[in-house]
Each structure stands twice: as structure tokens, then as C-alpha cells.
Design a protein with these regions (language model features):
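Aromatic-lined ligand-binding clefts that engage carbohydrates, nucleic acids, or primary amines
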Residues: 30-33, 37-52, 87-91, 170
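Extracellular beta-rich ligand/substrate-recognition surface
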Residues: 14-24, 62-71
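Short beta-strands within extracellular/lumenal beta-sheet-rich domains
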Residues: 20-32, 71-78
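Residues that flank catalytic or metal-binding motifs in active/ligand-binding sites
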Residues: 26, 47, 72, 108, ...
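An acidic-aromatic loop/edge-strand motif
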Residues: 1-16, 90-198
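Beta-strand-rich ligand-recognition modules
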Residues: 50-106
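Short, flexible loop/turn elements at secondary-structure junctions
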Residues: 34, 45-47, 65, 80-82, ...
Length: 198
């Protein structure tokens, strides 16, 4: 699989450079005249993602990077989950921050990459996003992962993975530009994952 120089990264518009672990939601709605026979995409995130289509779990990833020379990207086939009419693609992104596990590469805020040659879901525009304030990650003592999750249910996110959800109070996700990458570093060198998806 040949992966072009990766510039279709998205981030939250309110950049919050810091050490804390954070959770963010990204979503996009598309309208299809009929279900496609195939809808392949490439997806990865800083540092972990869970991908959903129309409320159905598709997959989680990416494979953990070994060093700063490569960031693993996953293929995903969305066609089995798509239907005629309105569709919702939703991604939960967990960012560990610099207080996270020392072997995890990181930017400075939750990031999502979507590569789509057909242009239906390209990361260049059309994505909505929000930070999730009801989930916190206090740093515990003596845990190998370096994080613990404390989650309080937020009614405002009920159904956020479905087409029925109203994301009008969310913000537009913004591109993580080449300029930012050159200035602050970032995961632009993507390589295919080397182990099977679980």
C-alpha cells in the first residue's frame, strides 16, 4: 500500500498545548444515493481511535509506533455499514499527552487522520468535533500505563454516533497544517500497519 505524504490531519480548533490526557469526538455526515459497493479509507489518530459508522463499531487502532520516523495507519472498509440516505461516521480519539506512556508518540492535542481517495470523507473539510469534558484521566501511582479513566455520563453526547444526533453546538475541525508540522513536529510520515487488526 502506497501512502502519500499525509496532510489530511484534523484537530480541535481550540489548541490546548499541555500535558493532560484528553478525549475528543469527531463526526461527519454524508448523504448517499445508494450504498456503495466499496468505501475504503485510511485512518489513524494521536494516539488511539475507535471508529463507528451509523452507531456500529467498525474497528480500533492504530498500531503503536516504534519511533518518530513512522506513524502507523490502518485501512478500513466502510461499505458494509453504509446505507442509502444520511450516514454518520464517528471517531473517538484518545490523546495521552506527555504524562502518558513514555513509548507513545504525541503531538500536542487530539488529532485524527482520514485518507479517502474518493473524497467522501477526506479530512480536508466537513468534520465536526468537540472535547469531552466529562472524562478525566487522573495520574495514578504505580500503574504501567500511566493513566486511569474517570468517566461521568454526559447526556448531551447521547446518540452522538448516529444520524439522529444534533452536532450544531460542536465546532468545525481544522487542518493540522504542514507549517505547524515544521514548527512543532507531527505525525506526517505514515506507514501501513505491520500486524493484523484485532
Amino acid at each position: 500500500m502506497e501512502i502519500p505524504f499525509a496532510t489530511d490531519w484534523l484537530r480541535l480548533p481550540a489548541r490546548k498545548d499541555g500535558n493532560e490526557t484528553r478525549l475528543a469526538y469527531f463526526r461527519r455526515q454524508i448523504i448517499l444515493s445508494k450504498p456503495p459497493a466499496s468505501c475504503p479509507i485510511l485512518i489513524t489518530a494521536d494516539a488511539r481511535y475507535k471508529l463507528y459508522v451509523n452507531g456500529c463499531f467498525v474497528q480500533a487502532g492504530p498500531q503503536k509506533a516504534i519511533d518518530a520516523t513512522a506513524w502507523y495507519v490502518d485501512p478500513a472498509e466502510l461499505a458494509p455499514f453504509l446505507r442509502a440516505g444520511k450516514n454518520a461516521v464517528a471517531v473517538e480519539v484518545l490523546y495521552f499527552g506527555s504524562d502518558g506512556h513514555s513509548s507513545l508518540l504525541e503531538t500536542r492535542t487530539p488529532h485524527l487522520y482520514i485518507g479517502d481517495e474518493n473524497g467522501r470523507l477526506s479530512g480536508k473539510s466537513g468534520w465536526r468535533c468537540t472535547a469531552v469534558d466529562g472524562v478525566s484521566f487522573p495520574k495514578p501511582q504505580n500503574t504501567p500505563s500511566g493513566t486511569r479513566e474517570d468517566a461521568a455520563g454526559e447526556p448531551r453526547f447521547s446518540g452522538w454516533k448516529t444520524t439522529m444526533y444534533d452536532d450544531s453546538d460542536w465546532e468545525d475541525a481544522v487542518p493540522y497544517t504542514l507549517y505547524e508540522k515544521l514548527l512543532k513536529g507531527g505525525p506526517f510520515c505514515l506507514v501501513p500497519r505491520t500486524i493484523p487488526l484485532i
